[in-house]
Each structure stands twice: as C-alpha cells, then as structure tokens.
C-alpha cells in the first residue's frame, strides 16, 4: 500500500495521482455497478482484476470486456483494495469464507452499501482500512456519464482507518468513477445505510408503489376504464419525476397547469398527512434499531416465503396486466432501453 501523509489539498492531489499508478483493485462481482466501476476505474488508469466464481454467468462478459478474471479468493490475495459489489445477502458468507482469509494485511475493503457492516453481519479484520463509496445512480448511468466526460455524484464514508489515509483512498476511488466531476459528499456507514433503506421503503419503492396501486384501484372501483386509470396514475408519473430530478418540486409546479398546482396544494395533504409522517417515523425506527434487518435476514434464511408471496401479489395486481398491454403499443420504449439489463447491486436485490 502507498504510505503518504496527507496534510494539504496539494498533497491529497499528489496522493491520488501517485495511487492511481500503483493501486491494484479487485472488483468482486460484475453486475450493473461492478461492471461500471471496473470500466471507469480502468479508464482512469487503475490496475483492475475481477473476482468471480469460475463458470459464473458474468465471467464471459468480464472477459469480453478485456479484464483478467480470477476466483474471488485469488483476486483478493493480489489486491491493495477489494471492492465488494455483490448483493447484500451474500456478502456475509463471501467475506467470512472467501475474503477474510485471503485479503492481505493493510489492504482496503470497500463497500457500495453499508448494511452488512453497520448492522454487524460483517466485522472486518482490524488490520484493514474499511470504506464505502456509493455512486448515486445505476451502473449504466455511472458508465455513460463517465464516457461523455461527466460523472455521477458519489457519497463516501470511512469505517476503519488503519493506514491513516483511508479517506484519501475512498476519494481516489470515487474520483476514478468520475464522481469528482460532479459532487462527492462525506457520510457515515450509519447514515448511508439508514437513509438508503428508508428512502427505498417509505418513498422510492414501497411508498410510490403502494400509492400508485391505491390510486389505480380507487379509479377503477369508481367505474373508470383501467386503461385510463393506468395512464393517469402510473404512466404520467415519469413526467413528474423527471421534473423533480431536474429541479425539485418547484420546477415540477412551474411546468404543470394552475389547476394541477391548486390540486397539489389542497388535495396532496389530504392523501399524505401527519399520520403518514408518523407511520414513516415508525418505518425509520425499525430501520434504526435493526428490526427490519433482523426480519429480512430471517426471511432470507427461511427461503423467502413471504417475499415470494408479496412479489406474486404485485405480479397479479390488475395494473400489471393493463400496463403490459398498453406498453406493448408504446414502440418508443424499445428504443429507450439501455443494455444495462442486470439488476442493480443494492439492498433491494437478492
């Protein structure tokens, strides 16, 4: 490992430049994020090896991309930094059985999500630097933005700093992804994990999905055509989210009609009110005290019986049948699809 004392912005830049030419990085996993990380880091000048199960489904893809592929244990042995980019629920076994016995002393262990470390499923060896670097976007976007000379914002955190330059390693890694071209924000494993889980459960996945289904059911039960209900509560959601993404809630309000604005002001609080916020707080509490993670681990170890039941119920919801029929006629959707068909590596992937 490079051993440099970081005292100024200049010396930090010097550290990053020198580290780029000497750091060997093992990327464990080659899904959406793993591939984007590997390609961007290689193009930034790092020496990259990929750690995958021999004969696994992504081995050929990594080799076609020009990478040396080794088994995870061998990749870890030869790396100065090991990036764990596999789904959450396989990381504990991967670390305990494969990585911990093989990572060399003084190396850096990097995660893209803090769940396993924060909740104690993984206790990293004390002789390692342990950091987190998480681009705030899917792998396809991380790669695409890098290729056109831009970048996706990243957050980073330090859990263990044995070398006294773990933070600089995290920043160097984030810079290699292209994050420094956009924005890099320091956080903690606790903050990243708890806010990420809350966002997924209360808003981005659980909250929005339940809101859309309830809206669809309300219209259909009132006698409106399912096709019209689908357009109004699901299809047009993209228009609103794109405006949120570009400039926040105020930008969305600038681009909708005055009628829509007034409806937002008077009816939004009737649907999402103080009681909703109280239930959100209960969701957050379950995340903070580990209740959610405890239940999720038990569910996973039991073979996912409830998970499968919930998933099947969503698949059988009437909005899915209607949506499939309507989307089949939206020929432009095919042209908008990217090659990034691998599910993102995160807490929501099994």
Curated annotation (Swiss-Prot):
For binding substrate, which residues are annotated in this chain's numbering?
Answer: 257
Residues annotated as catalytic: 113
Q: Which residues bind Mg(2+) 2?
A: 196, 232, 236
Binding residues for NADP(+), per the UniProt record?
30-33, 53, 58, 88-91, 139
Which pathway does the database say it acts in? Answer: Amino-acid biosynthesis; L-isoleucine biosynthesis; L-isoleucine from 2-oxobutanoate: step 2/4; Amino-acid biosynthesis; L-valine biosynthesis; L-valine from pyruvate: step 2/4
Where does the record locate the signal sequence feature?
none
**Which InterPro entries did the record assign?**
6-PGluconate_DH-like_C_sf, KARI, KARI_C, KARI_N, KARI_prok, NAD(P)-bd_dom_sf
GO cellular component annotations, sorted alphabetically?
Answer: cytosol
**E.C. number:** 1.1.1.86
Q: Where is the KARI N-terminal Rossmann domain?
A: 4-187
Which GO MF terms does the UniProt record name? ketol-acid reductoisomerase activity; magnesium ion binding; NADP binding
Q: Which PROSITE patterns match?
A: KARI_C, KARI_N
Domain called KARI C-terminal knotted: residue spans:
188-333
Q: State the Gene Ontology BP annotations.
A: isoleucine biosynthetic process; L-valine biosynthetic process
Per the entry, the cofactor note is:
Binds 2 magnesium ions per subunit.
Q: Which cofactor does it need?
A: Mg(2+)
Q: Does the keyword NADP apply?
A: yes
* List of residues binding Mg(2+) 1: 196, 200
Q: Which reaction does it catalyse?
A: (2R)-2,3-dihydroxy-3-methylbutanoate + NADP(+) = (2S)-2-acetolactate + NADPH + H(+); (2R,3R)-2,3-dihydroxy-3-methylpentanoate + NADP(+) = (S)-2-ethyl-2-hydroxy-3-oxobutanoate + NADPH + H(+)
Which keywords does this chain's UniProt record carry?
Answer: Amino-acid biosynthesis, Branched-chain amino acid biosynthesis, Magnesium, Metal-binding, NADP, Oxidoreductase
Which regions span the lipid bilayer? none
Describe the function of this protein. Answer: Involved in the biosynthesis of branched-chain amino acids (BCAA). Catalyzes an alkyl-migration followed by a ketol-acid reduction of (S)-2-acetolactate (S2AL) to yield (R)-2,3-dihydroxy-isovalerate. In the isomerase reaction, S2AL is rearranged via a Mg-dependent methyl migration to produce 3-hydroxy-3-methyl-2-ketobutyrate (HMKB). In the reductase reaction, this 2-ketoacid undergoes a metal-dependent reduction by NADPH to yield (R)-2,3-dihydroxy-isovalerate.
Give the family per the record. Answer: Belongs to the ketol-acid reductoisomerase family.
Name of this protein:
Ketol-acid reductoisomerase (NADP(+))
Q: What is the scientific name of the source organism?
A: Xylella fastidiosa (strain 9a5c)
Give the encoding gene's name. Answer: ilvC
């Amino acid at each position: 490992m490079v051993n440099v004392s970081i005292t100024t912005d200049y010396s930090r830049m010097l550290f990053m430049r020198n580290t780029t030419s000497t750091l060997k990085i093992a990327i464990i996993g080659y899904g959406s994020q793993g591939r984007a990380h590997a390609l961007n880091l290689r193009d930034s000048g790092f020496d990259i090896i990929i750690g995958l199960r021999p004969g696994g489904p992504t081995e050929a893809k990594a080799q076609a991309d020009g990478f040396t592929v080794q088994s995870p244990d061998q990749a870890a042995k030869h790396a100065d930094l090991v990036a764990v980019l596999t789904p959450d629920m396989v990381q504990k076994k991967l670390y305990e059985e494969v990585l911990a016995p093989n990572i060399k002393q003084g190396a850096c262990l990097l995660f893209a999500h803090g769940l396993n470390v924060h909740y104690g499923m993984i206790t990293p060896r004390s002789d390692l630097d342990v950091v987190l670097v998480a681009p705030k976007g899917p792998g396809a976007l991380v790669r695409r933005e890098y290729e056109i000379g831009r970048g996706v914002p990243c957050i980073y955190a330090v859990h263990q700093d044995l070398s006294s330059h773990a933070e600089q390693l995290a920043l160097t890694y984030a810079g290699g992804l292209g994050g420094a071209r956009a924005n890099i924000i320091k956080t903690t494993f606790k903050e990243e994990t708890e806010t990420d889980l809350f966002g997924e459960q209360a808003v981005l996945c659980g909250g929005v999905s339940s809101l859309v289904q309830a809206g669809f059911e309300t219209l259909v039960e009132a006698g409106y055509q399912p096709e019209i209900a689908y357009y109004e509560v699901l299809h047009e959601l993209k228009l609103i989210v794109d405006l949120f993404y570009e400039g926040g809630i105020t930008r969305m309000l600038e681009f909708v009609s005055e009628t829509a604005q007034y409806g937002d002001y008077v009816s939004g609080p009737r649907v999402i009110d103080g009681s909703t916020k109280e239930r959100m707080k209960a969701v957050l509490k379950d995340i903070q005290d580990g209740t959610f993670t405890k239940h999720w681990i038990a569910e996973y170890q039991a073979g996912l019986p409830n998970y499968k039941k919930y998933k099947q119920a969503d698949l059988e919801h009437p909005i899915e049948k209607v949506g499939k029929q309507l989307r089949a006629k939206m020929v432009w959707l095919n042209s908008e699809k990217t090659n990034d068909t691998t599910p993102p590596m995160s807490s929501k992937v099994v």
